[in-house]
Amino acid sequence: NLWQFGQMMSDVMRKNVVFKYLSYGCYCGWGGIGQPKDATDRCCFVHDCCYGKVTGCDPKMDIYTYTYSKENGDVVCGGDDPCKKQICECDRVAAICFRDNKDTYDSKYWFYGAKNCQEDSEPC
């Protein structure tokens, strides 16, 4: 669920970063339109696409299980429910994407606003 995603992001990035990504670019936050503005925003675009492929459960609400290793930074999705595991994998890939692209984060895209995202969206 979205709370767990925020926790996973904080685990992987080793600090509480949820507020920085809550409304960033054209895709970080609720929904998304237009073209991703940078690699950080593209992480959110890919995450939105991943959630869009989940069927049989609710990515924003359903609770999954995962473990995080502080030693090596690995996230491992667990549990027996394949749908919830798929949600966790979407979140895991996005959290790692944020970490790997943290240098592309540009504060000018924080609270960027949909009015600046009028280009045609690319397909997932």
Curated annotation (Swiss-Prot):
Catalytic reaction annotation: a 1,2-diacyl-sn-glycero-3-phosphocholine + H2O = a 1-acyl-sn-glycero-3-phosphocholine + a fatty acid + H(+)
UniProt xrefs under PROSITE patterns: PA2_ASP, PA2_HIS
Span of the signal peptide: none
GO CC list: extracellular region
Binding site for Ca(2+): 27, 29, 31, 48
A Pfam entry, by short name: Phospholip_A2_1
Disulfide bonds, paired cysteine numbers: 26-117, 28-44, 43-97, 49-124, 50-90, 57-83, 77-88
Protein localization: Secreted
One example of a Gene Ontology biological process annotation: phospholipid metabolic process
Entry-linked InterPro entries: PLipase_A2, PLipase_A2_Asp_AS, PLipase_A2_dom, PLipase_A2_dom_sf, PLipase_A2_His_AS
GO molecular function, one term: phospholipid binding
Function noted in UniProt: PLA2 catalyzes the calcium-dependent hydrolysis of the 2-acyl groups in 3-sn-phosphoglycerides.
Family to which this protein belongs: Belongs to the phospholipase A2 family. Group II subfamily. D49 sub-subfamily.
Protein's recorded name: Acidic phospholipase A2 2
Source organism of this protein record: Bothrops asper (Terciopelo)
Lineage: Eukaryota, Metazoa, Chordata, Craniata, Vertebrata
